[in-house]
């Protein structure tokens, strides 16, 4: 991340420190996308392991820049212990359910295009 300027210096260490200060082993952490710069799942493993080594149960959702996120079964098989992928389904822990779906422009919204957006919108319905 250092390539983006001094603000990003030591970014991984700062994430670890802040995470450990705020998150305990029994906490649930939602990670709503843009998880890795990788283009392929194999290349994202190091980032997933980084997240997996941190405390808490982690729920990951695919972001619009998560190009590495391939078939859900492959992603789930690659996740370290304590990490779970949500994609048009839910995760339940301690009587709390969290649903995960890709957000998209809805019919009737400004900028919605029937030809460009309908198929994606319908695919992401839960």
Which residues make up each language-model segment?
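Core catalytic region of metal-dependent phosphoesterases/phosphodiesterases
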Residues: 2-93
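Binuclear metal-dependent hydrolase catalytic cores centered on His/Asp/Glu-rich metal-binding motifs
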Residues: 6-9, 94-126
């Amino acid at each position: 991340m250092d390539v983006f300027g001094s603000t990003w210096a030591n970014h991984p260490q700062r994430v670890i420190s802040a995470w450990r200060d705020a998150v305990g082993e029994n906490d649930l952490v939602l990670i709503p996308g843009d998880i890795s710069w990788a283009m392929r799942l194999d290349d994202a493993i190091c980032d997933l392991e980084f997240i997996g080594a941190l405390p808490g149960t982690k729920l990951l959702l695919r972001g619009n820049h998560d190009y590495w996120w391939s078939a859900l079964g492959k992603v789930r098989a690659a996740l370290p212990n304590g990490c779970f992928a949500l994609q048009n389904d839910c995760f339940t822990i301690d009587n709390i359910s969290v649903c995960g779906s890709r957000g998209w422009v809805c019919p009737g919204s400004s900028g919605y295009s029937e030809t460009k957006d309908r198929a994606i919108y319908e695919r992401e319905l839960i």
